[in-house]
Curated annotation (Swiss-Prot):
Binds 1 zinc ion per subunit. Gene3D superfamilies: 2.60.40.2970, Collagenase (Catalytic Domain). Belongs to the peptidase M35 family. The keyword Disulfide bond applies. Transmembrane segments: none annotated. Residues 20-187 form a propeptide. It comes from Arthroderma otae (strain ATCC MYA-4605 / CBS 113480). This is Probable neutral protease 2 homolog MCYG_05201. Disulfide bonds join C195-C265, C272-C290.
Length: 373
């Protein structure tokens, strides 16, 4: 990985970034996504490149993600959103490999199938309504440097699901027995039996740094409307209040005495796949760190870069006991996160991590451009 910095032209580089549009119109979509039912709770998604040039699409946190993530929204017959029981990961955007991308030639398609019963709590038989939408980071063909984004919005799929058959589908994350969970420090919520001495020290420091970042961000969200508008698309007083309140909640949770989440230093579920820094199970308010988490810096001074502190902060926003409704992964990185409409931005975990990171960075920061070439 190489870092390219521009010292003399900091102002020239920052200004265009702040001038990016705050919303991505649907008519800019180059991606068509069609959902169809192929079984009781099995879904097939056909993703088509409608453009005239090849698209290199990052699969992380999209309809193409191979991990048990939230690929579709699922609503029951009463219009209530069905509980999601899968994982919400934070991916390492500094070390992208070509394996994480899907390249589609013009008018070409790729299929991806998944069973929603593996990641959703299907309690009753009946009609369910599904849809998918989001932003996909894009790179040049054969490249891994993110250079753009593609919006997608699927058809609305209605399907009948038999709950008894859905119950037979193996869950992506089954409830663990207490002896498998391990020893939990009741003051902090850290599963100490999952940590060696070094990991425990690092996690406690990350929580302390997360608290510091969240408190600084809460103050900024209450007093800096232009900065809230930059990251959340609006400086309305209600938005500023909600953002500040959520940062205060994260600060309360980022403590060594009194956390409501369960925090694992390591993963005992085998879900730390390549590229995952850490992940959360919102259905159980549980956070798991992955090996790559410990290779990140403790607290970076590079604006919009990843580190242990903002990864912990990011994951805490995924927990319903911290933020309700819990934040999802709707857009990754500054460009995609600030391209979301306000209604999505305030529900996107990375907006909070990015906002908190900037508030802790020097005023005259060095922009970072990532290349894995």
């Amino acid at each position: 990985m190489q870092f390219f910095t521009a010292l003399a032209a900091v102002g020239a580089l920052v200004a265009p970034a702040l001038a990016l549009p705050t919303q991505v119109p649907a008519n800019q979509s180059l991606i068509d996504v069609q959902l169809s039912a192929t079984g009781n709770s099995m879904i097939k998604a056909v993703i088509t490149n409608k453009g005239t040039r090849a698209l290199n699409l990052l699969k992380f946190n999209t309809i193409m993600d191979e991990n048990p993530t939230a690929k579709v929204m699922v609503f029951d017959k009463n219009g209530a959103e069905v509980e999601f029981t899968g994982m919400l990961p934070r991916y390492d955007m500094n070390s992208l490999s070509t394996d994480y991308f899907a390249t589609l030639a013009p008018q070409a398609s790729v299929e991806h199938s998944f069973d929603i019963a593996a990641t959703h709590n299907i309690k009753e038989s009946g009609k369910y309504t599904l849809s998918a939408h989001g932003l996909i980071p894009t790179a040049e063909e054969h490249g891994t440097t993110i250079t753009g984004q593609a919006f997608y919005e699927s058809n609305t799929l209605e399907m009948e699901i038999d709950a008894s058959k859905a119950a037979m589908v193996p869950r992506a994350f089954e409830e663990l027995d207490a002896h498998i969970v391990g020893t939990i420090d009741k003051r902090s919520g850290i599963v100490t039996s999952s940590c060696d001495a070094s990991q425990l020290r690092i996690v406690k420091q990350a929580l302390a740094n997360s608290r510091m970042l969240a408190l600084n961000a809460a103050r900024a969200a209450s007093s800096n409307p232009s900065k809230v508008r930059e990251y959340f698309g609006s400086s309305d007083s209600s938005i500023m209040q909600k953002v500040a309140s959520r940062f205060q909640s994260v600060a309360r949770e980022s403590t060594a005495s009194g956390g409501q989440t369960t925090y694992h230093c390591t993963d005992n579920r085998g879900s730390c796949k390549p590229g995952v820094l850490a992940y959360t199970l919102p259905s159980t308010n549980t956070v798991y760190n992955c090996p790559s988490y410990y290779r990140e810096p403790s607290l970076t001074k590079r604006c919009h870069a990843q580190d242990q502190a903002t990864t912990t902060l990011h994951e805490l926003t995924h927990n319903p006991v911290v933020v309700s409704p819990f934040c999802k992964d709707l857009g990754y990185g500054y460009r995609l996160a600030t391209g979301l409409p306000t209604s999505k931005a305030i529900q996107n975990a990375d907006n909070y991590a990015l906002f908190a990171n900037e508030e802790s960075s020097p005023v005259f920061f060095v922009p970072v451009f990532y290349s894995n070439g």
